[in-house]
Every structure is written in C-alpha cells, then in structure tokens.
Amino acid sequence: MTGDMLSQGKVLVVEDLHKSFGSLEVIKGVSFDMDFKERLVLMGPSGSGKSTLVRCINWIEPPSAGRVTFDGKLVESRKYDIRRLREDIGMVFQQFNVFPHLTALQNIALGPIVVKKVDRKAAEAEAMELLAKVGLSHRADHKPGQMSGGEQQRVAIARALAMHPKLMLFDEPTSSIDVELIHEVLDVMVKLADEGMTMIVVTHEIGFAKEVADRVIFMDQGLIIESGSPCEVFEHPQQERTQSFLSKVLLA
C-alpha cells in the first residue's frame, strides 16, 4: 500500500495511526494520504483528536501504533532523523509560539542560523523578505509584547517558512486571536495556499476551508467520520454527526 501511494507522488501517508495517553486512546486507527501541494482541512468537535493527529505527524507526540511515511521515508524515532523531519514539516500552534525576548526579525532568522548554519546576514535578509510576505516589514524590530496577537501569529508563520518546509501544519492558528484580527492570519494562509504550499489546517473557519481546501476531513472521537471536497462535506454531509456539528458551527 505504502509503495503504491508513494509512487503516485504522495508527500504524506498515514496508516492505521493510534495514539494513547495512558489508558485513554485519543486516535483510534486513522488512515489518509496527501499529494504535494494539496490543502487539507481537519475539522471536528473539541476532543476529536485533530490536534493530536497533527502533533503525531511531526513526531511531537510519537504515535502509539501505525505508520507515518513522509516524503518517501518511513518515520521511526530510532531510524529517522526527527530533527530533519521537523525542518521539513513546519508547524504553527494555537498559541503564538514566538520568543518574547527576540524581535520579529530575530525570531525568524534564528532557526536558519542555529539549525541550518545559514550566514547571519543571509538569514536576516530572508527574514525581512518573509516579514514583507506576511505584511510586517514595519514590525521587524518589535518584540512580541509590542505586537497584537494577529501580528505575533504572522511572525510565527514567517518563522516556520524560514526553514523552507515541504509541509505546513496549522493547529487552530486563529483560536487565540481577537475576532477582528483573524482575517490578518487567514489572508496570509490563503496567500500561501495560492502559492502551492502543501498544508494541513485544523480550523473551524468554514469560509477559509471553502476557499482554500482541496479536501476536508471531519473527525470525531479519534476517528475519521467523513472526508470529501468542501462542497461534499459542507453542502451534502452524509453522516449525522457531521450534519449536527456543522449546524451548530454555522449558527455560532
């Protein structure tokens, strides 16, 4: 199965993935695959396993069972270079995961300098380009405490992009941002999608999903309940659990 999928250009193959914390099984046998440049949105109620799933993909949470194959290589903690995996898979978290004592420019340049041994001037030059990309050139010398939540999250996105990832994971990137500022982050993500970035996005932003997603996966209780195009999942959901969830989200 894995070999056939990879021969068709799959960047990610997840097979029968399980994750338990003690006696609590959070992911209960999830399987899916992704093409290069595909945009995948994960949706579902709180506690459905969405965030745990993306954290298993880049080995922040090692799976309890199952297989993750990324870019043609089976990911195993003892055989695969996990640090290299995290260079190739960028992640943006719910909270603004930026260093409070560093400026926006320093936050973005740090990874390439420390991990990839890029020359400081070159790293800072690219950091300025990335700040422009996310609309924050004027914030280069500002520290996180001097920026809004939306600005901090855009710095976090730029910092992940500085490592030139092959896949970007977004774990509810707008959940901690004031409603009035959510569009700042979503606009950047739409731009990345338009440029062909391969993305997995955990979100409840249905408008974003309709605009960007090639495919939507709906999860509940650690399982994939439904999967399809945005039109199929949002306009013609087949499962009662999906219908119930969407009716509540759309009324919120």
Give residue spans per PLM region:
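C-terminal boundary and immediately downstream tail of ABC-type ATPase nucleotide-binding domains
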Residues: 231-252
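ABC family nucleotide-binding domain
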Residues: 7-14, 18-230
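Pre-NBD coupling/linker segments of ABC/ABC-like ATPases
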Residues: 1-6, 242
